[in-house]
Curated annotation (Swiss-Prot):
Its main location: cytoplasm. InterPro entries: AB_hydrolase_fold, NDRG. This is Protein NDRG4. One of its GO terms (biological process) is negative regulation of smooth muscle cell proliferation. GO terms for cellular component: basolateral plasma membrane; cell projection membrane; cytoplasm; cytosol; endoplasmic reticulum membrane. Residues 308-323 have a biased composition (Low complexity). Contributes to the maintenance of intracerebral BDNF levels within the normal range, which is necessary for the preservation of spatial learning and the resistance to neuronal cell death caused by ischemic stress. May enhance growth factor-induced ERK1 and ERK2 phosphorylation, including that induced by NGF. May attenuate NGF-promoted ELK1 phosphorylation in a microtubule-dependent manner. It holds the Pfam family Ndr. Expressed in the brain and heart, weakly in the kidney; most prominently in postnatal brain where it is expressed widely in the olfactory bulb, cerebral cortex, hippocampus, cerebellum, thalamus, and medulla oblongata. Belongs to the NDRG family. The keyword Phosphoprotein applies. Keywords: Cytoplasm, Phosphoprotein. Residues 301-352 are annotated as: Disordered.
């Protein structure tokens, strides 16, 4: 991979071009951070608030960041021709190895929201050796049946596409109150994302199949995510039930479940600081950025109790050579707490 690929790229895949934006340059053998946005959004609408945060930039300067836009969802995308077949959710996942290979990434840490979380989970199931860890926000592991399909069709007859998408993105309370954030996203979804292309992506997401994962030991030959996973959802978010169910199907020794209060449907937009703090501890638990300075701690602030628990659940010794030289570390799943908590072998649910 060249010294720096910073900027926009169109990557050829078996299912068409994929728009990708690279920020930064490779850092030794460290994984790339790869993001995938939710339906109705693109990488800018979904992740700009989070990745523009100063504390997040303190983290991402240690990695190359790769933002992936689903086909036809990027700013200024041309409308697909009549009869274009939008890739299935599984096909979207199988497009990602082309991105990884194009830039020479050895493996990635994925951050996905909603539909993007589903795509990244599918990617990790099909290509487990390419995925080092996953942060999955608002993921729904369940497929959509005929009843769901009919309900979606009916909703489409009585609501505009942007309003239908908003009901997927935001909590009922946010929609009823018609918050400034909801108004802003209604306007941007209507004007920034090509509506015909969005309709195709929306239809495909609502035709998805079950992820078909099960917690190890619950069924013979259970298939589940093998990498460390941090699940994130806001209180009363539309995806809350789906994320809870996903949590029940993952390996509890490598899964952290973060339920965020007062964050609504888009925690990466409404609570980017808390999410960044959790992400930092998640990375440290995998053996990365051990010596990252917390800007707020130098001013006398202390981490929230919930984040301290998250750190204890995800972090072991952070002074290993792997944290310094960028070689691939082994996921850490035990505590370094002085309180004698011992090995953590259960899902850590944290509310903050």
């Amino acid at each position: 991979m060249p010294e720096c690929w910073d900027g926009e790229h169109d990557i050829e895949t078996p299912y068409g071009l994929l728009h990708v934006v690279i920020r930064g340059s490779p850092k030794g053998n460290r994984p790339a951070i790869l993001t995938y946005h939710d339906v109705g959004l693109n990488h800018k609408l979904c992740f700009n608030t989070l990745f523009n945060l100063e504390d997040m930039q303190e983290i991402t300067k240690h990695f190359v960041v790769c933002h992936v836009d689903a086909p036809g969802q990027q700013v200024g995308a041309s409308q697909f021709p009549q009869g274009y077949q939008f890739p299935s959710m599984e096909q979207l996942a199988t497009m990602l190895p082309n991105v990884v290979q194009h830039f020479g990434f050895k493996y990635v840490i994925g951050i996905g929201v909603g539909a993007g979380a589903y795509v990244l989970a599918k990617f990790a199931l099909i290509f487990p050796d390419l995925v080092e860890g996953l942060v999955l926000m608002n993921i729904d592991p369940n497929g959509k049946g005929w009843i769901d399909w009919a309900a979606t069709k009916l909703s489409g007859l009585t609501s505009t596409l942007p309003d239908t998408v908003l009901s997927h993105l935001f909590s009922q309370e946010e929609l009823v109150n018609n918050t400034e954030l909801v108004q802003s996203y209604r306007q941007q979804i209507s004007s920034v994302v090509n509506q015909a292309n969005l309709q195709l992506f929306w239809n495909m997401y609502n035709s998805r199949r079950d992820l078909d994962i099960n917690r190890p030991g619950t069924v013979p030959n259970a298939k589940t995510l093998r990498c460390p996973v941090m699940l994130v959802v806001g209180d009363n978010a539309p995806a809350e039930d789906g994320v809870v169910e996903c949590n029940s199907k993952l390996d509890p020794t490598t899964t952290t479940f973060l339920k965020m209060a007062d964050s609504g449907g888009l925690p990466q937009v409404t609570q980017p600081g808390k999410l960044t703090e959790a992400f930092k501890y998640f990375l440290q638990g995998m053996g990365y950025i051990a010596h990252l300075k917390d800007r707020r701690l130098s001013g006398g602030a202390v981490p929230s109790a919930s984040m301290t628990r998250l750190a204890r659940s995800r972090t072991a010794s952070l002074t290993s050579a792997s944290s310094v030289d960028g070689s691939r570390p082994q996921p850490c799943t035990h505590s370094d707490s002085s309180e004698g908590m011992g090995q953590v072998n259960h899902t850590m649910e944290v509310s903050c």
